């Protein structure tokens, strides 16, 4: 019986002084371990999704952690019958998720995590507003019932939406949500940097929430857009064909 391919997704906001120096080291171990996928490196941290045997993807993750020294690392592993990636790429970027805001220190300055098991109770409180930080075509497929859709085409538009909606956010506990956690985590840092104190985000994002809770209270409506060959998943994480989403 053939071994399943492990697909490891990970990110961490951690200060990396010379991220370019890590590229040859990660390429070396990745190629030796037959890893495919992409790892993005920046001064603000790392963001990667790569595939291989379970043992080998974890060896690459261990090397990445050893080289960067993060306090918190977000990791999720799924499985597939085939590699979803063609080759290994390790790239240097200005940001690991592009927002185009300078001088954000997400590692030290971000909101509080809300665990998936506590999310439903938290977002149904009167003084909490939920903001879906994903792009409009993702929100269109599915979102939380109470979530505000900023109607952004790219994540780079989100800071402008925040500036234009100060009154909406004033005096509220703000709960951020996104697919896997990285965009909502960076969004909380943006809000903290401009003076909002009570800012929160869903740990592990929508996918972790659906896996952990099975949407038992039906606060999630629709499907969840994902950036791979599945295109969208239902609330039990079953894949859905969505050819019209390829835009």
From Swiss-Prot:
Active site: 178 (cysteine persulfide intermediate)
Catalysis performed (reactions): uridine(34) in tRNA + AH2 + O2 = 5-hydroxyuridine(34) in tRNA + A + H2O
Key words, A-Z: Oxidoreductase, tRNA processing
InterPro entries, per database record: Rhodanese-like_dom, Rhodanese-like_dom_sf, TrhO, TRHO_N
One Pfam short name: Rhodanese
Function recorded in the entry: Catalyzes oxygen-dependent 5-hydroxyuridine (ho5U) modification at position 34 in tRNAs.
Annotated organism of origin: Rickettsia peacockii (strain Rustic)
One biological process term in Gene Ontology: tRNA modification
Entries under SUPFAM superfamilies matching the protein: Rhodanese/Cell cycle control phosphatase
EC number: 1.14.-.-
UniProt protein name: tRNA uridine(34) hydroxylase
Similarity remark: Belongs to the TrhO family.
Every Rhodanese domain range: 124-218
Enzyme class per UniProt: oxidoreductase
NCBIfam families on file: PRK01415.1
Gene Ontology MF terms: oxidoreductase activity, acting on paired donors, with incorporation or reduction of molecular oxygen
């Amino acid at each position: 019986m053939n071994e399943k391919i492990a697909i490891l997704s990970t990110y961490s906001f951690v200060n990396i002084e010379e991220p370019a120096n890590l590229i040859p080291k990660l390429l070396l171990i990745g190629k030796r371990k037959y890893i495919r996928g992409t790892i993005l490196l920046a001064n603000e941290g790392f963001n990667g999704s790569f595939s291989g045997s379970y043992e080998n993807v974890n060896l690459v993750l261990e090397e990445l952690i050893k080289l960067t020294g993060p306090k918190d690392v977000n990791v999720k592993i799924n499985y597939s019958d085939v590699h979803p990636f063609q080759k290994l790429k390790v790239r240097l970027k200005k940001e690991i998720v592009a927002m185009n805001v300078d001088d954000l220190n997400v590692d030290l300055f971000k909101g509080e995590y809300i665990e998936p098991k506590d999310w439903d109770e938290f977002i149904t409180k009167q003084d909490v507003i939920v903001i879906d930080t994903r792009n409009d075509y993702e929100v269109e497929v599915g979102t939380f019932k109470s979530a505000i859709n900023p109607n952004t085409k790219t994540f780079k538009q989100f800071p402008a939406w925040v500036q234009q909606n100060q009154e909406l956010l004033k005096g509220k506990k703000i709960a951020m949500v996104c697919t896997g956690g990285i965009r909502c985590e960076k969004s909380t840092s943006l809000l903290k940097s401009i003076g909002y104190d009570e800012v929160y985000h869903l740990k592990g994002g929508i996918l972790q929430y659906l896996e952990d809770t099975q949407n038992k209270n039906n606060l999630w409506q629709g499907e969840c857009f994902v950036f791979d060959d599945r295109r969208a998943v239902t609330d039990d994480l079953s894949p859905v064909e969505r050819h019209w989403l390829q835009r």
